[in-house]
Amino acid sequence: MVEPLLCGIVLGLIPITLAGLFVAAYQQYKRGKELGV
């Protein structure tokens, strides 16, 4: 009975992880643009 819970956790974490990576990349890009790189 643990597998459905694990599946839910994984399915919940994947979008959060992708969103976090996207935000981090966007902030880095914006900061680089401000520095004129």
From Swiss-Prot:
Component of the cytochrome b6-f complex, which mediates electron transfer between photosystem II (PSII) and photosystem I (PSI), cyclic electron flow around PSI, and state transitions. PetG is required for either the stability or assembly of the cytochrome b6-f complex. This is Cytochrome b6-f complex subunit 5. GO terms for molecular function: electron transporter, transferring electrons within cytochrome b6/f complex of photosystem II activity. GO terms for cellular component: cytochrome b6f complex; plasma membrane-derived thylakoid membrane. The gene is petG. The 4 large subunits of the cytochrome b6-f complex are cytochrome b6, subunit IV (17 kDa polypeptide, PetD), cytochrome f and the Rieske protein, while the 4 small subunits are PetG, PetL, PetM and PetN. The complex functions as a dimer. The lineage of its organism: Bacteria, Bacillati, Cyanobacteriota, Cyanophyceae, Gomontiellales. It comes from Cyanothece sp. (strain PCC 7425 / ATCC 29141). It is found in: Cellular thylakoid membrane. It is a single-pass membrane protein.
